From Swiss-Prot:
GO terms for molecular function: calcium channel regulator activity; toxin activity. Transmembrane segments: none annotated. It is found in: Secreted. Insecticidal toxin that is lethal to cockroaches. Inhibits voltage-gated calcium channels (Cav) in rat cerebellar granule cells. Belongs to the neurotoxin 12 (Hwtx-2) family. 06 (TXP1) subfamily. InterPro entries: Hwtx-2-like. Disulfide bonds join C4-C25, C8-C31, C17-C36. It comes from the Eukaryota. Its main location: secreted. GO terms for cellular component: extracellular region. Expressed by the venom gland. This is Omega-theraphotoxin-Asp1f. Coiled coil: none annotated.
Amino acid sequence: IFECVFSCDIEKEGKPCKPKGEKKCTGGWKCKIKLCLKI
């Protein structure tokens, strides 16, 4: 699990990169420059 540098509440493929209220990315995503990237 990677910590998000930016607030990343974007949804991609129906899955939130960082769910609201969470401080870290979940579900195999990480945030980079406000983009959700699959890891």
